[in-house]
Regions:
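Conserved SAM/SAH cofactor-binding pocket of Class I
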Residues: 21-91, 97-100, 106-108
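Short amphipathic alpha-helical segments
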Residues: 69-70, 110-112, 158-161
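SAM/dcSAM-binding transferase cores
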Residues: 182-236
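Residue-level signal for inorganic ion chemistry
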Residues: 19, 101, 131, 189
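Mobile active-site "lid"/loop adjacent to the S-adenosyl-L-methionine
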Residues: 103-130
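Conserved Class I SAM-dependent methyltransferase catalytic core
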Residues: 2-5, 12, 125-176, 180-182
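S-adenosyl-L-methionine
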Residues: 1-26
């Protein structure tokens, strides 16, 4: 799959690939909304591999929606796009699943001078509370919110999910290297559910020799080829 990205903008990383595989294993069906789609790589991978899924890609940035359209056309994948701020989004439609790789860096971290990656990375642009609360509004009963987040903030994640009547039903930790602490938590939470939480085996990205066999296998499964693109000022 060919994915065009802004040369000087936010670029997807291994977190996206890990989340893609996590969602693929869950295999949600029906109407799926991706919040903060960026260049569209997560949603397009799922549209390619989940035959019973209808994907809608949402982003607050106009240039990202254009990238989603370019990438969906390039790969001949039929998805919908919505240019909107999820915090302000209003719709009567209810989704079977909402997926997101949300921003989780806090404001104390030194920011880039480039606005595009800042909006994608920092939680001030879409707080965890906003994501969870608004997902509850736009999900069907027992619909799934599937996302990744900073593993160090898992207690806050669990609190906000319970506060908004979600039940965490699946959890998987991603470790940057064997012997290191978990960096990312992959989470599925179901609205109005009382299910127990299944904790998956952890995933290790690298060892002393480089990427693990499991990571290389996953990268091959994703089969991504990234290309840089520069959008002109007029890209309606």
């Amino acid at each position: 799959m060919i994915i065009y990205q802004l040369k000087d903008g936010y670029r997807y990383n291994s977190d996206t690939i890990m989340l893609y595989n996590f969602i693929f294993d869950i295999s949600p069906k029906g109407d799926i909304l991706e919040v903060g789609a960026g260049c569209g790589v997560l949603g397009l991978l799922l549209k390619r591999d989940l035959k019973n899924a209808n994907l809608t890609l949402m982003d607050i940035q106009k240039e990202n929606i254009k990238l989603c359209e370019i990438n969906s056309n390039e790969n001949r994948l039929d998805v919908n796009t919505i240019l909107a701020d999820f915090k302000e989004f209003k719709s009567d439609k209810r989704y079977d699943a909402i997926i997101s790789n949300p921003p989780y860096y806090h404001d104390g971290v030194i920011k880039s001078e480039n606005l595009h990656p800042n909006i994608s990375r920092y939680s001030s642009n879409l707080s965890l509370s906003d994501l969870i609360q608004n997902s509850s509004t736009h999900l069907k009963s027992h619909g799934s919110l599937i996302f990744c987040y900073d593993a160090k903030q898992l207690m806050n994640v669990a609190y906000l999910l319970l506060k908004n009547k979600f039940c965490m039903t699946k959890l998987k930790f991603i470790y940057p290297k064997i012997g290191k602490k978990a960096k990312i938590a992959l989470i599925e939470a179901k609205k109005s559910s009382k299910s127990l939480c299944l904790v998956d085996e952890g995933f290790y990205l690298s060892d002393e020799n480089g990427y693990t066999k499991e990571a290389l296998k996953l990268f091959k499964k994703a089969n991504l080829e990234s290309k840089d693109i520069v959008l002109g000022k007029n890209y309606d």
